[in-house]
Amino acid sequence: MSQQLSPINIETKKAISNARLKPLNIHYNESKPTTIQNTGKLVRINFKGGYLSGGFLPNEYVLSSLHIYWGKEDDYGSNHLIDVYKYSGEINLVHWNKKKYSSYEEAKKHDDGLIIISIFLQVSDHKNVYFQKIVNQLDSIRTANTSAPFDSVFYLDNLLPSKLDYFKYLGTTINHSADAVWIIFPTPINIHSDQLSKFRTLLSLSNHEGKPHYITENYRNPYKLNDDTEVYYSGEIIRAATTSPARENYFMRWLSDLRETCFSYYQKYIEGNKTFAIIAIVFVYILTAILFLMSRRYSREKQN
């Protein structure tokens, strides 16, 4: 068993840039969700088909299941942290080494048996139509220890973030039952608050009074990083960056949301006062450009 328990807080300035961490080949086009479960602690979706290869992997790792974690509030629900920044939630995609081991149960006994991909969820002003396909299934598993067929066409590729650079470290599964190599995508995917709140309506296992209660949160707090634990990064050296990927993404999301608001305002008032609407949208674009250039300049100054 690995001495490093998961999850952890990833300090980007201490991550080691590793040229051997090539881009992953993610083959989810043939993956198909079979069942969705409320385990009483989390939402689990079982898959048939789909696998990982390439990158640092010696062979193919078959997709087994997807787990979802969340918190009481939208700003605190992920297991892993990036520079002490917690996201709204987290998806874990569990894979096992089918070429080397005969079953998932056999694979979990070895430190090269499991690969877990982590995808962060970030609440924004817009619904994620692909994530909604999961949300739509939740009514069928409202009570604990229930399972139902996943009766919707669902393409897992659509839940991958826009950037696939990643952190890597050797830790454990979230319940500490086995070793696992973690692949953490620092770029999140956006979902709406209403979509995340639906998970808080699920019922957990009965408490000591014999009464079920809502799973309002199920994330785990991070464990201290051991002195000999090394976290690697697949991208360029990030120690020179002034902000963590999380904060940098937050700023870019803010700019994106600002533009979306501007376009909505433009569409709303274009018929009533076209001149005013055009002036407003030009002003916001100029402001966005200024803020973006300021952030880039500040980043270069800190790097030097």
UniProtKB/Swiss-Prot annotation:
It comes from Variola virus (isolate Human/India/Ind3/1967). The gene is OPG105. GO terms for cellular component: membrane; viral envelope; virion membrane. Signal peptide: none annotated. Belongs to the alpha-carbonic anhydrase family. The chain crosses the membrane at residues 276-294. SUPFAM superfamilies: Carbonic anhydrase. Keywords: Disulfide bond, Host-virus interaction, Late protein, Membrane, Transmembrane, Transmembrane helix, Viral attachment to host cell, Viral envelope protein, Virion, Virus entry into host cell. Residues 1-235 form the Alpha-carbonic anhydrase domain. Binds to chondroitin sulfate on the cell surface to provide virion attachment to target cell. It comes from the Viruses. InterPro entries: CA_dom (IPR001148), CA_dom_sf (IPR036398), Carbonic_anhydrase_a-class (IPR023561). Apparently non-glycosylated. Residues 295-304 are intravirion. SMART domains: Carb_anhydrase. Induction: Expressed in the late phase of the viral replicative cycle. Residues 1-275 are virion surface. GO terms for biological process: symbiont entry into host cell; virion attachment to host cell. This is Cell surface-binding protein OPG105. It is found in: Virion membrane. GO terms for molecular function: carbonate dehydratase activity; zinc ion binding.
